[in-house]
Design a protein with these regions (language model features):
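Glycine- and other small-residue-rich loops at beta-strand/loop junctions that grip anionic moieties
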Residues: 40-44, 98, 129, 170, ...
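Solvent-exposed, flexible loop/coil residues
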Residues: 75, 79, 83, 90, ...
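Active-site rim beta-loop-alpha module in soluble metabolic enzymes
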Residues: 101-182, 186
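Metabolite-binding pocket within alpha/beta catalytic cores that recognizes anionic/polar moieties
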Residues: 2-116, 147, 162, 234
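Conserved active-site and cofactor/substrate-binding residues in soluble primary-metabolism enzymes
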Residues: 18, 46-53, 104, 135, ...
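Regulatory input/activation interfaces that engage signals or partners
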Residues: 173-237
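Short alpha-helical interface patches
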Residues: 17-28, 32, 134-142, 187-192
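Short acidic/polar alpha-helix capping motifs at helix-coil junctions
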Residues: 17-19, 118-124, 198-199
Length: 237
């Protein structure tokens, strides 16, 4: 991702190894941090605490700006899997305005990507736990004005703000606002740093036809989001 001055080093934080694959970085497990052609990449694992630790690790490598790259769930029904959100603001609490993202980097990314990807701007909400039901998604959208939700962007933005370095996020949508995730899958996700775990596989295997259908559609849409991230990485290189 080449946004910013050519000599600047970017600290890119992703939650999952599959998200790192989209920028050509392989073999890095959660907790890892490796050099990258534009700076450093950290794979944090899922969730805010992991994301904050990863941002602090990569910042210590001497980067000039921080970025969060990965997938998010839609709160706005107009967003579909494979769409790309470049948020202008990250929020995490109803009584806090959150963090603005760097406008110059946003504009550079949007211009680079808009020829081949559907780009959306707006507020990204960072949750502590998965937002899984349609009712919860609708309530969060109405209360916050956010168009999508993730679990990592806000703590990374907070680290960037404390260090006084620019921050940007790019999120490919993997979960539509209209999807209801089975409770079995949500519980397994909530207890995992890596996304797919043995507990998730067991939850799917023993969940019955409804869970199997949900898992298939989730995997399909995650694939669409991952393809969008790979396209974005190629266009922004």
């Amino acid at each position: 991702m080449s946004a910013g001055a050519p000599t600047e080093r970017i600290g890119l934080i992703v939650a999952l190894p599959a998200e790192a694959h989209s920028i050509g970085v392989r073999g890095v497990q959660p907790g890892g941090c490796v050099p990258w052609r534009h700076g450093w990449v950290a794979v944090s694992g899922i969730g805010p605490h992991n994301a904050m630790r990863a941002a602090e690790r990569v910042l210590a490598c001497g980067v000039d700006r921080l970025a969060n790259w990965g997938v998010a769930g839609a709160l706005d029904a107009a967003l579909t899997p494979g769409d790309v959100l470049i948020p202008d603001r990250i929020r995490y609490a109803h009584d806090d305005p959150g963090f603005a993202t760097d406008p110059d980097t946003r504009e550079c990314l949007a211009m680079a990507l808009c020829t081949r990807l559907r780009i959306r701007h707006g507020t990204l909400w960072s949750a502590v736990r998965p937002v899984a039901t349609c009712a919860d998604k609708q309530a969060l959208a109405a209360a916050s004005g956010a168009v999508a939700v993730d679990m990592e962007a806000a703590p990374i933005a907070a680290v960037a703000a404390r260090a006084k370095v620019p921050f940007v996020a790019l999120k490919a949508i993997c979960d539509p606002a209209t999807r209801e995730l089975p409770a079995r899958i949500v519980r397994a996700m909530d207890g995992s740093d890596t996304g797919v775990s043995w507990s998730m596989l067991a939850a799917i295997a023993f969940g019955g036809p409804g869970t199997w259908r949900a898992a298939r559609s989730l995997a399909r849409d995650f694939g669409r989001a991952r393809d969008a991230l790979a396209t974005a990485a190629a266009l922004a290189a």
